[in-house]
Amino acid sequence: MTSVAGARWGLVFWEQAGRTYAGVTGPETRTGTAPVPEGATFTGIEFAVGASLRSVPTPALVDGGIRLPDTTRRTFRLGGARWETPGPDDAEALVDGLVRAGTVVRDLLVAEVLRGHRPAVSRRTVERRFRAATGLTRGVVRQIERARAAAELLTAGDPAADVVTKLGYFDEPHLARALRSYVGRTVRQLREGGGGAIALDLGQRLTS
């Protein structure tokens, strides 16, 4: 499966051959190939840009991740506590619990900047906070999020010229380069569904 660059970290749970596993996935700065174990079933949760784990610095997760120990079908260990292993319908309850316990925290300044607000701090401070919260620069976060949005619009049938205008690309070659770097697909492949399986799920659960 083609993996897609992403500015968000996440939790992933999977079952394979009767065993249950859990891990933390980090932000990804480029497209690549992700192995998919045969017969495995997955549940994934992506966290909003600016959210982070108190016990694991996000920069340490970039282009990687960690396997969580002591995982069973019923529970897993994270941040010094045990949590119920979620199914697809239990993700929101798990996230609420992680936030209440302080296991997951969020930098509100990063969230405000992403919404277009101009904080009363220096650009250097904003950049430092972005790196601490996401492991990435503000510019890289913006480029990755824009490329993913472009891929979603193209998959939905929007013309490339409209995507260029809507998302602020210079021209169609600029859009094409971004898609190759961050999504691993051409405009035509996205519109026609070509290129094989891709880790770009329009219905994937996303937390704020």
Predicted regions mapped to residue ranges:
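Alpha-helical bundle regulatory/interaction domains
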Residues: 1-123, 133-138, 152-155, 159-170, ...
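DNA major-groove recognition helix of helix-turn-helix
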Residues: 130, 142, 179-180, 191
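Pre-recognition alpha-helix immediately N-terminal to the DNA-recognition helix
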Residues: 146-149
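The feature captures the conserved acid-bearing segment of alpha/beta-hydrolase catalytic domains
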Residues: 169-171, 178-182
